[in-house]
Amino acid sequence: MDKLKISANGPLNGEITVSGAKNAALPLMCAGLLTSGTLRLKNVPMLADVKTTQKLLQGMGARVLTDNISEFEINGGTVNNTCAPYELVRTMRASILVLGPTLARFGEAQVSLPGGCAIGSRPVDQHLKGLEAMGAEIVIEHGYVKAKGKLKGTRVAMDVVTVGGTENLLMAATLAEGTTVLENCAIEPEVVDLAECLVKMGAKISGIGTSTMIVEGVDELQGCEHSVVPDRIEAGTFLCAVAITGGRVVLRNAAPKTMEVVLDKLVEAGAVIEAGDDWIAIDMRQRPKAVDIRTVVHPGFPTDMQAQFMALNAVAEGSCRVVETIFENRFMHVPELNRMGANITTEGNTAFVQGVEQLSGAVVKATDLRASASLVIAGLAARGETVVEQIYHLDRGYENIEKKLGSVGAKIERVSG
């Protein structure tokens, strides 16, 4: 199993190109099931989850072509199987996103209950409740969600804000008979990106980017060409890496307007930030200052950046509190950071961080996707060598992270065994 070996190597300097967002690419790929036409996606990150989604769609009969760099062509005209099996779904929660489009287009779907990162309860009850409100008959048996029925437009008020639930119901509503009103929608940039692509495909959606979307169902959707929105979490991860090591790095193919709260927190930590329409520059010449973090739904501070800022706060001047309100059990990186010399205690959903002057390298284990990113960031500033194990988590969400960081001066290498 691959590992990353990391050693501090001074400030980072240069340019990094940000990949497309995994959390946008996966639902966009699933949207290919809504049409018999061809959906052409650009700026797709070549990640483990993307490849799993490719296999899943191909297993359902869709024709999926890729240049293995950043482009995919998905044709749903050849779909001949409405079942998403456990073997693929178990590794990735986003697999549940085939449920809505498959049911809407074919009138039936079977999807194994999903897997993914072990960061607490992330149930799919809102997905199922919404589809039932639209007329679906749903049973759960033998580990599968089995749904059938012709969907009809209705009012769906989600009990909690859910990104995946919003995406699943939005896709389903595009082909439902009549008008669907989706209330308490997630407004993350990735949801907006999906909605904008669906409109290109012929969907009639109003209220995009707000908590209430109105969808007028159409008889069919067409293919289109769409570029995946840049990954704000990958961009934020690289910015934290520069903030902890010092230096100046420019991120290209970035989307600063999707991550303003993260940029504000970096400024609060002492970084100088400049940004244009599609680039972000960070200049860090001092020890970071501790910053309080409270994760909330977009447009607040994203839970997917909590672990990276925990690493930054670990070596910051002063003390702070980090409050996690989105997921329980999302402090699994804390014991690993403490193994490196951090001074972090937890109480319920709150972590108390007392900054130390320097961390020391250690062998640490990645426990989930963003936790693994925090350990990489910590290793860049630690004295001695850090070895991050179980980096298959990292590969689910970061495209060539060691090459990108290495290109700006980080001492980081992937090793086998």
UniProtKB/Swiss-Prot annotation:
Chain positions recorded as UDP-N-acetyl-alpha-D-glucosamine binding sites: R93, R122, P123, V124, D125, Q126, D304, I326
Keyword terms of this UniProt record: Cell cycle, Cell division, Cell shape, Cell wall biogenesis/degradation, Cytoplasm, Peptidoglycan synthesis, Pyruvate, Transferase
Origin superkingdom: Bacteria
Active site, UniProt feature: C117
Modified residues (2-(S-cysteinyl)pyruvic acid O-phosphothioketal): C117
Annotated binding of phosphoenolpyruvate, by residue: K22, N23
GO molecular function, one term: UDP-N-acetylglucosamine 1-carboxyvinyltransferase activity
Entry-linked InterPro entries: Enolpyruvate_Tfrase_dom, Enolpyruvate_Tfrase_sf, MurA_subfamily, RNA3'P_cycl/enolpyr_Trfase_a/b, UDP_GlcNAc_COvinyl_MurA
Alphabetical GO biological process terms: cell division; cell wall organization; peptidoglycan biosynthetic process; regulation of cell shape; UDP-N-acetylgalactosamine biosynthetic process
Catalytic activity: phosphoenolpyruvate + UDP-N-acetyl-alpha-D-glucosamine = UDP-N-acetyl-3-O-(1-carboxyvinyl)-alpha-D-glucosamine + phosphate
Entry-linked NCBIfam families: murA (TIGR01072), PRK09369.1 (NF006873)
PANTHER family named among the record's database cross-references: UDP-N-ACETYLGLUCOSAMINE 1-CARBOXYVINYLTRANSFERASE
Family the entry assigns: Belongs to the EPSP synthase family. MurA subfamily.
Function: Cell wall formation. Adds enolpyruvyl to UDP-N-acetylglucosamine.
Protein name per Swiss-Prot or TrEMBL: UDP-N-acetylglucosamine 1-carboxyvinyltransferase
Organism: Neisseria meningitidis serogroup B (strain ATCC BAA-335 / MC58)
Gene name, Swiss-Prot/TrEMBL: murA
